[in-house]
Amino acid sequence: MILIDLGSIRNPAANCGVYGFKPTAFRIPTDGWCSIAAGADAIPAVIGPLSTSLEGIKLFMSTVIDSKPWLSEPALIPMPWNYQACSPHQPLKIGVMWHDEVVTPHPPITRALCEVVTKLDAMPNIEIVDWKPHLHSEAWAILSSLYFTDGGEETKALLAESGEPWMPLTSFIVKDNPCVKKLTPKKMYYWQEEREAYRKEHAKIWNDTATGAGGEGMVDIILCPVGPGVAPKHNTAKYWSYTSQWNLLDYPAVAFPVSKVDKEKDNVNEEFSAMTDVDEENHNLCRLFLLEYHAVD
């Protein structure tokens, strides 16, 4: 299955216990597809695969990119698909982001992350370090200001034309979002400058993880939750920053299955202390999500 990602590849993958890959922008051809506000690329949507296997992800990407789509879509990056495994001569350095300092993941997510880290840490060719998140609340302010630069007018017009009602989460991200405003050119330039400044700050943080000259010993991968919980009850998925963060930065990202909810292990923390108001809201949803058949990515 092929989806368009502003979180809409990785979240369905995580909710269903399958693999989902968000490439960087301008990797996969977009001829023949359509979206709301087509041509608005302040935060470009990208196309990527869902699959029941990692091999399916690799097959999709290699097949599409081996066809050299940049010959017909010049905006695409003319770069082959490269698959490079780690080895004793080229160890992998993984930075683990346990939470984003805004919202604490629910117990199944943290447990699954612990299990993955434990297995990776036992491998001789992998180094594990902690990754400190960089101002994710600020990142969300930038991102959500650039999602609907027309103030949501096209979305509102399409819904009015269709006669369909506003769904709760659509209202949440468009109508109720204080950052959604019709931007003047001057404001548009401001937020795009903020986007680029944030990207540079993040790049410096990443580059500073190097332990040797020329970037040697730098973190290769950030391992983190896909979201703050497992598949949510309808109309409750209001915290998007675990996925949208990587859209703002335009980093590739993959969701992969790890486990399922285990009620013997995944107990609600009764002594929980919230970092933020939205963290408290997310914690209060925890009991709704802890169903044993739920996948954990």
Positions of PLM-derived features:
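Short glycine/serine-rich loop segments
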Residues: 1-64, 252-257
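Short, solvent-exposed loop/turn segments at the edges of secondary structure
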Residues: 13-16, 23, 39-45, 89, ...
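Amidase signature
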Residues: 63-244, 248, 258-294
